[in-house]
């Protein structure tokens, strides 16, 4: 019907919406730009080709250019909550970054951030994106500046697909089975990865479309992304079974000459999760338990409810 067609189109904000959004400009300190300075620290290079990634058939599996309407120099539209707009602006700061000595990150090649930690002989990859294609592109960008270092280790910090799905973009089954590359994950990782992404994956995927507004057009009257990131890539999701499971807090493991000290965090942002500390680099990774977002204790897509008491304890232990 004509009415249904009209209802499907974005509408201008009501006066009430404008007033509520404008009120946030007074309630929060938007003059503080420290987060923007922090997010740009160590910047090396922008994502090549606008960040667009294609598969072997030439199909686009990742296209961040659809979110170019968001920029750090652009004012918040009156259709958008200013706090959400600010978060989206921070997410638009993508590329290759050097976060500290021997640690690099590629941001903006998927929902998650992929990290590269340089060992004695090669590089250890932490959380290799959703798809093999985006992880491969991130590794290529890192190697452009750091050289063709072999991947000597992969760490899955937790059991969500955006932290392991691209593993075959950074290593091979042969390198893993031969011992050239170790894959480390928290105890219970495989069971939880399968239960959420395979057994419940179809139902959760459908609910995610409502939760994230995946089918809504990108734009200030549509969707700005998924909050934690923009969206997920649509490439090849892969999984290589971990060769080493971490079972208890305080467990230490040396990977490519670097000692890792692990802290278990099951039942936090994911059912199977851990944090780790690298004493030699004075570097701490808290997976997705200390992000600049509201802690996602419950997701509308139907992931397992997280234990807020445990989560808080892991961050203060």
Question: Which residues does each predicted region cover?
Answer:
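Conserved beta-strand hairpin/beta-sheet module of binuclear metal-dependent hydrolase folds
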Residues: 89-149, 274-278, 282-288
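Metallo-beta-lactamase
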Residues: 98, 122-124, 130-132, 184, 190-266, 310-315, ...
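Short, solvent-exposed loop/turn and secondary-structure capping segments
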Residues: 117-118, 135-138, 166-167, 183, ...
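Active-site metal-binding motif and surrounding structural segment of the metallo-beta-lactamase
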Residues: 121-122, 132-182
